[in-house]
Amino acid sequence: MCSNFQPIKTEHAQWVEEQFGCSLPEATWRAETYPTYPAPFISLQDGKPNCDLAQFGLVPHWADDKKKFGLRTYNARSETVHEKPSYRHAWKERQFGLAIMESFYEPCWETGKAVRWRIKRADTQPIAVPSIWERFIDKETGEVIFSFSMLTVNADGHSIMQHFHKPDDEKRSIIVLNEADYLPWLHANHEQARSLLKVAPDNFLVSELAPR
């Protein structure tokens, strides 16, 4: 499960335009993203890709504490996303998006304590992660709440992702799509979406120590 990533940098604005035909938001965001932080996110607007800041950690409209809810909804298991109360509306409505980033971080416990590692694409290109999103106007504050959760899959046996998290925990991974699958994901029906939710090929990613 991924709770920390390095969002896309403005230096890759041209990559966003080439891949999605839209621009990065005219805003600032933190160098690292944690749950409830805003980060650049791709979703369809009037049928076309659009990039805006969205909160990492999905907030459904019925959430009581909308400020803290995202602390526990930043990842959604792909196997159960269609039935979990927090996620099923976004999945049913095919609110599919992409979290765009430079790299993401995971803890390796093989030394007996958590050591942070960075995972990125082997070709150093930005990463796009299949996600679901919600957007609504808070009736109490009038604020537009736009938020997302990254989908995860089992990663047991993956050459890189099997090394992260505690020894007895199931190995999970976010999904890193190939460029050819970006637009198909955004426009997918449920069957098509399911076919894209799989762990990245072993040679697609590399990892390195990234201590704080």
Q: Where on the chain are the PLM-derived regions?
A:
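Short linear sequence motif anchored by a di-proline
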Residues: 1-212
